[in-house]
Regions:
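Surface-exposed interfaces of beta-sheet-rich extracellular modules
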Residues: 27-63, 143-180
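Conserved "repeat-terminator" motif of extracellular CCP/Sushi domains
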Residues: 70-91, 97, 187-204
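Extracellular/surface recognition and adhesion modules
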Residues: 1, 34-35, 45, 84, ...
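Short strand-edge motifs at loop-to-beta-strand transitions and within beta-strands
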Residues: 18-22, 66-68, 80-82, 133-138, ...
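Short, solvent-exposed loop/edge segments of extracellular or virion-exposed proteins
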Residues: 1-15, 53-55, 63, 96-104, ...
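Surface-exposed coil/turn segments at beta-strand junctions on protein surfaces, enriched
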Residues: 15, 23-27, 63, 75-77, ...
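Tryptophan-paired
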Residues: 1-33, 112-148, 152-153
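Extended low-complexity, serine/threonine- and proline-enriched intrinsically disordered segments
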Residues: 1-2, 47-49, 109-117, 161-165
Length: 204
């Protein structure tokens, strides 16, 4: 432990904050606390802890028990600064359009831009029976609430439109608010979606 310990430090995203400096001595070992978050969800972030001097045993800032050995050489750095860096977890999003058998080529479907993402897909349209997608996948952030627009187009009322989403080929962390693609629906991007390609398909 330390003869002198730092106080609790609170910080609001996205504001960098510094605690009050305390005096430490060569030969001491500091136990670094696990970061907590309230309000908010710590699971939506990766937290990396780093120190500019001394010997650090671990870098996961969400884990308890990381220690910093204050070596004689480390005392040449004053103050020794340990930084917790939070990086939002991300995924990607692409929309797709599929048609069932007996779809008419004279019909069409238009799917507007999503909203609520760090980045959003753009409007695209396609003729009946022709598969399409929104183009290159866009990067979104865990915690985003994505709003999917209602599908529109020629003779859309003649079809049932089902909206479904997959993350990396499996289930998304959270469920869609609804599956009727002819009305607006939402999906909250969860921590379990981190690093995955999310594809949401409107099927007529």
């Amino acid at each position: 432990g330390l003869i002198n310990n730092t106080a609790v430090l609170n910080s609001t995203a996205s504001t960098n904050s510094n605690g009050v400096t305390v005096t430490v001595f060569a030969g001491e070992t500091a136990t670094l606390p696990a970061e907590t978050m309230s309000p908010g969800a710590l699971a939506n972030y990766t937290t990396t802890v780093s120190c500019d001097a001394g010997t650090l045993t671990g870098t996961n800032g969400q884990s308890a028990g990381n220690t910093l050995a204050i070596t004689a050489a480390a005392t040449a750095t004053s103050p020794i600064t340990c930084t917790y860096t939070n990086t939002p977890k991300t995924a990607t999003l692409q929309l797709a359009k599929a048609w069932g058998a007996n779809s008419s080529a004279s019909d069409s479907a238009s799917i507007g831009a999503t909203t609520g993402g760090t980045n959003n897909t753009t409007l695209f349209s396609t003729a009946g029976g022709t598969a399409a997608n929104s183009g290159a996948a866009v990067a979104i952030t865990v915690g985003n609430t994505i709003t999917f627009p209602a599908e529109t187009g020629t003779n859309i009322g003649n079809y049932n439109t089902v909206l479904s989403c997959l993350a990396g080929g499996g289930a998304t962390a959270n469920t869609l608010s609804g599956t009727n693609g002819q009305v607006s629906n939402t999906l909250v991007i969860g921590a379990g979606d981190s690093g995955k390609a999310i594809v949401c398909t409107y099927t007529n």
